[in-house]
Amino acid sequence: MRSFLLLVTLTAALAVSAPAQIPFDNNRNQGVGVTVGLASGAGISYQEILPSALGYRAAVLAWKTGDSSFFDIGVSGLRVLSDDGRRRVYLLASMAWWRRSGEKAEVAFDDEGNLISERVFDDVDDSGAIGAGAGVELPLGPSAAISLEAAFTYWTDSGDLIPAPQASLHWLF
């Protein structure tokens, strides 16, 4: 909770200190990288900021090993509040969906410990999240940036509203 409050405070401080707006910058309106977040999803991501100060980000991650598989897809809508040419402060709305699957074996034994039956079944877990919050994009060099976000997230697994940090690392072009 402390790190979440720190991120909100940092975002608010940067929003106050970065009121200048610059014209749309074609050299930093798109980004490819990685995103990690409960509401935004996790994985390889693409981000684009449009001339209207609206933007979007999509993330996808998938893997399969043996009988197990995992799939995650997330999308975020962004509204830029402030952009001084180096950093952006924005609002975001995100949603993500995960699916984990695998096979489990259920065995039954008699009183003497002998195997009497074995049943294999699919074990599937779906969950989703939807969230809204604020973020800041900070430069890491001439063509790289890190985004730090704080989002209040509703998670379907628990039914709770969770204050969750999110982060992205993007190469801008």
Stretches with model-predicted labels:
Residues 1, 17, 21, 49, ...:
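Selective for proline/serine-rich intrinsically disordered segments
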Residues 1-26:
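Cleavable N-terminal export/targeting peptides
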Residues 32-44, 62-71, 85, 154-164:
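Solvent-exposed loop/turn segments connecting transmembrane beta-strands
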Residues 24-36, 91:
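Transmembrane beta-strand segments of Gram-negative outer membrane beta-barrel proteins
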Residues 28, 144, 158:
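Solvent-exposed, flexible loop/coil residues
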Residues 47-148, 166-171:
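Gram-negative (and chloroplast) outer-membrane scaffold detector with strong preference
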